[in-house]
């Protein structure tokens, strides 16, 4: 609600900028167009209308706002839905109001119109389409891929008012009737029927003479005159009927010559359109071949890079395995030497311990009170503790080596598993695959 009730009603109006979709921009296959092409639309002006006005009411009054010449005769309203423009159906025009085309319901206060184009590429507009073109478009129907123009095409509004044209058509028709009558064959069943009726009437009136032979010659002459007058009257009636039926033919402009010329123009237009379509199809085929070649080259490059990356990864893993096996072979001999040295160390340790214990036994009778405080006993304890520490260190080193080896093997197994999964998905999808680059380094 406005705070100032005395403000004029024009403050409640909304201004909308009207745009036309240019020819060739609309995607008839998808029946939509992207909003990125809005900058190329043609401006038809702006309108100031009530936001409560529906599209159906605006269609009737759009010529008043923009002018008859600026408004197409047949057009469709478009509405921005997402990133594309969609066609507004006839039922939706009575429901949608103009406020939905202005902020805050829309990004911009703009109204988009799509002119309807006929099958010959002509845009229906009030300034360019004449009555004759509309009738020719309405009377031309397409059946099984060919254009058919019916014979009962009505004349344009300018033709009935032209007397010279009527005279010419009447003269052509009479000439045609005379030419048809000069032919030996009968062209019209109705005319032959009328001629037959005339002959039968003459025969009838001629046969009436036989029962009245006693009549005078004057009476016979009078009867002959009456018969001749009756035949003339019937002939005039037949001519009047034909003459009264002829003006109805004026309503049909598709005389043989006009029909042939119109069909020739239609066939020529169809040939031109067909040639254009064939050329466009050839261009599209060439572009498609070119794009397919580029696609094949790109696929080959991707496959080559994929193979190179795959070979690098496999080479790194193979080199690591080779190093591991080589070091394992070397360490086998070193482990044998180490075990021998450990056995020798154990022997030396046992000998030293035996010597110290023997010396301790010899020194016992002298110093029975201070056995625990003797140097020999302390040396024995130190030796045992040192031996235990050495064993713990060796065990710690072996456990550490096993742990490092297990971690490296697990990392390598995870990378191999991911590679196998990627190869499997690639085979299922049937498309070239670009493997992911792992951040972890190859174990050494």
Swiss-Prot record:
Keywords in alphabetical order: Coiled coil, Cytoplasmic vesicle
Name listed for the protein in its UniProt record: Spermatogenesis-associated protein 1
Cleavable signal peptide: none
Residue stretches in coiled coil: 268-403
Tissues expressing the protein: Highly abundant in the testis, and is also expressed in the heart and kidney (at protein level).
Chief localization: cytoplasm
A GO CC term assigned to this protein in UniProt: acrosomal vesicle
Location relative to the cell: Cytoplasmic vesicle, Secretory vesicle, Acrosome
Species annotation: Mus musculus (Mouse)
Source species taxonomy: Eukaryota, Metazoa, Chordata, Craniata, Vertebrata
